[in-house]
Amino acid sequence: MPPPHVRAWYSYAFAAEVFSSYPSGNIPANHFGTCDGKALQSSDPRGMDRYSFVQSSSMYVKSIAVACQAICIISIGPLADIAYWRKRLLLTFAYSGSLSGILFLLFPPLPYAWTPIMAAILNIVGNATYSTSIVCSNAFLPGLAKEDVDVQKAWEEATSEGLQDGLRDVHEDTDEENTGSVSREDEATHLLPDRLIPAVCAISTQDLALSDPLAKLIEPSNAKKHYESRLSLTTSRLSSTGTAIGFFSGVSVLTLLLIPVTALGGSTFSMRLAIGLSGVWWALFTVPTCIGLPGGAPGHGSDFSASQVKKAWVKIGKMVAPKQIHQLPNLYIFLLAWIFLSDGFHTTTYAAILYASSVLSMSAPKIILVGILVQLAAVVSSVLVPRVQRRLSTTSSKPVTNYKVLLAGVVAAAFIPVYTCAGLVLPFGGLRSEGEMYVLAVWFGLVFGPFLSYSRAVYAELIPPGHESTFFSLFAFTDKSASFIGPAAVGLISDLTGNIRYGFLFLLVMLVVPIPVLGRVAVERGRREAVEWAERSRKEMSDERV
């Protein structure tokens, strides 16, 4: 049985992932164009114009929601790093988000002029509060890892060797500024709170990076390294377990929600009911989190100041300075490709749900089934692909690197918009049936899972040693903030053409253009650049101290 604090932390993953799993992005569109969940009849010319707007409206809402969540994530970063604010922010965002879902239950049975606007606002609030609450939740992770019995034992062994001074900044969970070996210049470049970084790194990322056949695994040589290794492994274990619990909760409840949605014929009310129940679930299972997670007492840093938010935004500029880009070209080339790919992958999920609803006229239960297939396929591929990679690497003269797996995954993902766009010129195929949608959902899931894992793995290989927190902060920021352009562009294309299928041409560009950019990344050279950058930074720090 996990310790009480860990159980409380797991409870939040169990609570929140249900809300994020339900494909609620089509609710605002349904309120624009339907009274009972059915699409507008295409025989009405005025209805066709309105139907085109229905298609694009949810994409605009999704774009605004992603932009808002990026702003919130950056702004609350400094506060989430303070124990006093961390739990308070988590509960505030959690119950604000759950309330945004529950309020869908209060909508009238027939749409009024204000219902689409209110649905869009609730959608934006739900997305933004969910993402920011996850930031606050992940900020607890390092402290929970340090409470582990094995980590405590490793700490005692390290201190017995007289290494406590060198480990003090690593082990102590305090909100005061460290005065140890971490440079203030390096700290100034963090985009997200330090306690969030291990959570970003831990979900199979470091394991994948170290499992690369071309990467060297360095075993701990003393008690200090043993402690740091044990802390990292414990963080990874807790994070992976939390992710698994969240996935189990999301898929299970999503499957259960098929019952009322199917029983009610996939009407707008059934979808509002599903979202409302997701909000109730989120609020209910946040109660153990509220009771069990530790809360900080008022003290140093507990006073809120607008300068804290300003400081968080100043950090962004320092991360993309020309000097940084020049010294680490391969890392920033990869980030450039990642921005396009992340936007393309996430927009594909939004566009596919809208396409299934508006073009294929798939009912709400069938759309939920599509979401379940994507998640199940993603988990299966995330487990199987690393095993296949290792087996191929051991049986082949040339190792299958993380970079090769990632590149293959991106090429495979481009098949989806290619196949959909084929429907513009071919009289058959091209995603014209529900069966094709199910097949593409499985295909996308098989590609999407490894894409996320191996993107982080390749990026981990390009990061300067000892500066993981700084550069994973940038990676996390681009992951959360890059996906607002795609939905807006697809929505605009749908408005201008009256056919959302043309939006997949844009998605094709978003997925194909980064391929040659990604092909320019030289991982081996990038590793050397990262080591040289770290050594140069260490030397500059030493000179400043002298």
UniProtKB/Swiss-Prot annotation:
Chain residue ranges for the region called Disordered: 160-185
Gene3D superfamilies for the chain: MFS general substrate transporter like domains
Transmembrane segments: 64-84, 102-122, 124-144, 244-264, 273-293, 333-353, 365-385, 405-425, 435-455, 473-493, 503-523
CDD domains according to UniProt: MFS_Atg22_like (cd17483)
One CC-aspect GO term: vacuolar membrane
This protein's record includes keyword Nuclease: no
Membrane-related topology note: Multi-pass membrane protein
A single GO BP: amino acid transmembrane export from vacuole
Disulfide bonds: none
Localization (cell): Vacuole membrane
Coiled coil residues, start to end: none
Listed SUPFAM superfamilies: MFS general substrate transporter (SSF103473)
InterPro entries: Atg22, Atg22-like, ATG22/LtaA_families, MFS_trans_sf
Pfam families noted in UniProt: ATG22 (PF11700)
Keywords: Amino-acid transport, Autophagy, Membrane, Transmembrane, Transmembrane helix, Transport, Vacuole
Family as reported in the entry's similarity comment: Belongs to the ATG22 family.
Functional summary from the UniProt entry: Vacuolar effluxer which mediate the efflux of amino acids resulting from autophagic degradation. The release of autophagic amino acids allows the maintenance of protein synthesis and viability during nitrogen starvation.
Protein name listed in UniProt: Autophagy-related protein 22
Organism of provenance: Cryptococcus neoformans var. neoformans serotype D (strain B-3501A) (Filobasidiella neoformans)
Gene (name only): ATG22
